[in-house]
Protein backbone atom coordinates (compact mmCIF):
# COMPACT_ATOMS: atom_id res chain seq x y z
CA UNK A 1 0.00 0.00 0.00
CA UNK A 2 1.23 3.50 -0.80
CA UNK A 3 2.21 5.91 1.95
CA UNK A 4 -0.53 8.29 3.14
CA UNK A 5 0.17 11.86 2.04
CA UNK A 6 -0.49 14.41 4.79
CA UNK A 7 0.35 17.54 2.80
CA UNK A 8 2.47 19.49 0.40
CA UNK A 9 4.85 22.35 1.16
CA UNK A 10 5.80 24.77 -1.62
CA UNK A 11 8.89 26.91 -1.08
CA UNK A 12 11.42 28.93 -3.05
CA UNK A 13 14.87 27.99 -1.81
CA UNK A 14 18.21 29.40 -3.06
CA UNK A 15 20.23 26.69 -4.83
CA UNK A 16 22.84 25.13 -2.56
CA UNK A 17 21.91 27.38 0.37
CA UNK A 18 19.12 25.50 2.16
CA UNK A 19 19.41 25.90 5.94
CA UNK A 20 17.02 25.38 8.88
CA UNK A 21 16.27 29.09 9.32
CA UNK A 22 12.93 30.58 8.15
CA UNK A 23 11.14 29.93 5.84
CA UNK A 24 12.35 26.31 5.58
CA UNK A 25 12.54 25.43 9.28
CA UNK A 26 9.02 26.49 10.34
CA UNK A 27 7.36 25.14 7.17
CA UNK A 28 8.86 21.67 7.59
CA UNK A 29 8.80 21.68 11.39
CA UNK A 30 5.04 22.12 11.63
CA UNK A 31 4.65 19.00 9.47
CA UNK A 32 7.07 17.09 11.70
CA UNK A 33 9.66 16.56 8.95
CA UNK A 34 13.42 16.27 9.50
CA UNK A 35 14.66 19.74 8.52
CA UNK A 36 18.39 18.92 8.34
CA UNK A 37 17.73 15.84 6.22
CA UNK A 38 15.88 18.02 3.68
CA UNK A 39 18.58 20.72 3.73
CA UNK A 40 21.39 18.20 3.09
CA UNK A 41 19.47 16.41 0.31
CA UNK A 42 18.42 19.70 -1.36
CA UNK A 43 21.94 21.15 -1.25
CA UNK A 44 23.36 17.91 -2.68
CA UNK A 45 20.88 17.90 -5.59
CA UNK A 46 21.47 21.58 -6.41
CA UNK A 47 25.29 21.43 -6.39
CA UNK A 48 25.64 21.91 -10.16
CA UNK A 49 23.27 24.88 -10.29
CA UNK A 50 24.38 28.50 -9.83
CA UNK A 51 24.51 29.08 -6.04
CA UNK A 52 21.82 31.43 -4.74
CA UNK A 53 19.47 31.03 -7.72
CA UNK A 54 15.96 30.69 -6.18
CA UNK A 55 14.39 27.34 -7.08
CA UNK A 56 10.77 26.40 -6.44
CA UNK A 57 10.54 23.10 -4.57
CA UNK A 58 7.44 21.04 -3.79
CA UNK A 59 7.84 18.83 -0.72
CA UNK A 60 5.39 15.95 -0.25
CA UNK A 61 4.97 15.03 3.43
CA UNK A 62 3.85 11.52 4.39
CA UNK A 63 2.12 10.28 7.57
CA UNK A 64 5.24 8.40 8.73
CA UNK A 65 7.17 11.75 8.81
CA UNK A 66 9.10 10.90 5.65
CA UNK A 67 9.09 13.16 2.60
CA UNK A 68 10.00 13.47 -1.06
CA UNK A 69 10.66 16.66 -2.97
CA UNK A 70 10.67 17.85 -6.57
CA UNK A 71 12.84 20.76 -7.66
CA UNK A 72 11.33 22.87 -10.45
CA UNK A 73 13.12 25.23 -12.83
CA UNK A 74 13.82 28.82 -11.68
CA UNK A 75 11.01 31.39 -12.14
CA UNK A 76 10.89 33.04 -15.60
CA UNK A 77 11.11 36.52 -14.09
CA UNK A 78 14.47 35.77 -12.46
CA UNK A 79 15.90 34.28 -15.67
CA UNK A 80 14.63 37.28 -17.69
CA UNK A 81 16.11 39.81 -15.23
CA UNK A 82 19.43 37.95 -15.36
CA UNK A 83 19.44 37.92 -19.19
CA UNK A 84 18.60 41.63 -19.41
CA UNK A 85 20.95 42.58 -16.57
CA UNK A 86 18.50 44.41 -14.30
CA UNK A 87 17.59 43.90 -10.64
CA UNK A 88 13.84 44.49 -10.99
CA UNK A 89 11.20 44.97 -13.67
CA UNK A 90 9.47 48.22 -14.56
CA UNK A 91 6.81 49.60 -12.20
CA UNK A 92 4.94 50.87 -15.28
CA UNK A 93 5.72 48.32 -18.02
CA UNK A 94 3.54 49.99 -20.68
CA UNK A 95 5.47 53.28 -20.63
CA UNK A 96 8.87 52.70 -18.99
CA UNK A 97 11.10 49.97 -20.47
CA UNK A 98 13.99 48.58 -18.42
CA UNK A 99 15.89 46.79 -21.20
CA UNK A 100 15.63 44.54 -24.24
CA UNK A 101 15.82 40.80 -24.81
CA UNK A 102 16.55 38.95 -28.06
CA UNK A 103 14.90 35.83 -29.44
CA UNK A 104 18.10 33.83 -28.81
CA UNK A 105 17.97 34.78 -25.11
CA UNK A 106 14.26 33.87 -24.98
CA UNK A 107 15.01 30.46 -26.55
CA UNK A 108 17.72 29.81 -23.95
CA UNK A 109 15.27 30.62 -21.12
CA UNK A 110 12.55 28.51 -22.79
CA UNK A 111 14.93 25.50 -22.94
CA UNK A 112 15.53 25.85 -19.20
CA UNK A 113 11.80 26.21 -18.43
CA UNK A 114 10.43 23.67 -20.96
CA UNK A 115 9.86 20.82 -18.48
CA UNK A 116 7.68 23.06 -16.26
CA UNK A 117 5.73 24.85 -19.02
CA UNK A 118 2.52 23.59 -20.59
CA UNK A 119 3.67 24.75 -24.04
CA UNK A 120 3.34 22.18 -26.83
CA UNK A 121 6.56 23.15 -28.62
CA UNK A 122 9.57 25.44 -28.35
CA UNK A 123 7.93 28.32 -30.28
CA UNK A 124 4.95 28.36 -27.90
CA UNK A 125 7.34 28.33 -24.94
CA UNK A 126 9.28 31.28 -26.40
CA UNK A 127 6.02 33.23 -26.82
CA UNK A 128 5.06 32.46 -23.21
CA UNK A 129 8.43 33.74 -21.92
CA UNK A 130 8.15 36.79 -24.22
CA UNK A 131 4.78 37.63 -22.64
CA UNK A 132 6.34 37.46 -19.18
CA UNK A 133 9.16 39.74 -20.34
CA UNK A 134 6.72 42.29 -21.79
CA UNK A 135 4.74 42.40 -18.54
CA UNK A 136 8.01 43.22 -16.73
CA UNK A 137 8.68 46.20 -19.01
CA UNK A 138 11.31 44.52 -21.21
CA UNK A 139 11.35 45.19 -24.98
CA UNK A 140 11.14 41.88 -26.86
CA UNK A 141 12.98 41.70 -30.21
CA UNK A 142 12.31 39.14 -32.94
CA UNK A 143 9.08 37.58 -31.67
From Swiss-Prot:
SMART domains: RL11
Keyword set, alphabetical order: Methylation, Ribonucleoprotein, Ribosomal protein, RNA-binding, rRNA-binding
GO MF annotations in UniProt: large ribosomal subunit rRNA binding; structural constituent of ribosome
InterPro entries: Ribosomal_uL11, Ribosomal_uL11_bac-typ, Ribosomal_uL11_C, Ribosomal_uL11_C_sf, Ribosomal_uL11_CS, Ribosomal_uL11_N, Ribosomal_uL11_N_sf
NCBIfam families (alphabetical): L11_bact
Record note on quaternary structure: Part of the ribosomal stalk of the 50S ribosomal subunit. Interacts with L10 and the large rRNA to form the base of the stalk. L10 forms an elongated spine to which L12 dimers bind in a sequential fashion forming a multimeric L10(L12)X complex.
Annotated function: Forms part of the ribosomal stalk which helps the ribosome interact with GTP-bound translation factors.
Lineage: Bacteria, Pseudomonadati, Pseudomonadota, Betaproteobacteria, Burkholderiales
Protein name as catalogued: Large ribosomal subunit protein uL11
Amino acid sequence: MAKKIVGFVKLQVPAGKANPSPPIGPALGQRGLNIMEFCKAFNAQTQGIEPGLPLPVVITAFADKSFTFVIKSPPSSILIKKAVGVTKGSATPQSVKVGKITRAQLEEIAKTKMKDLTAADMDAAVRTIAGSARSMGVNVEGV
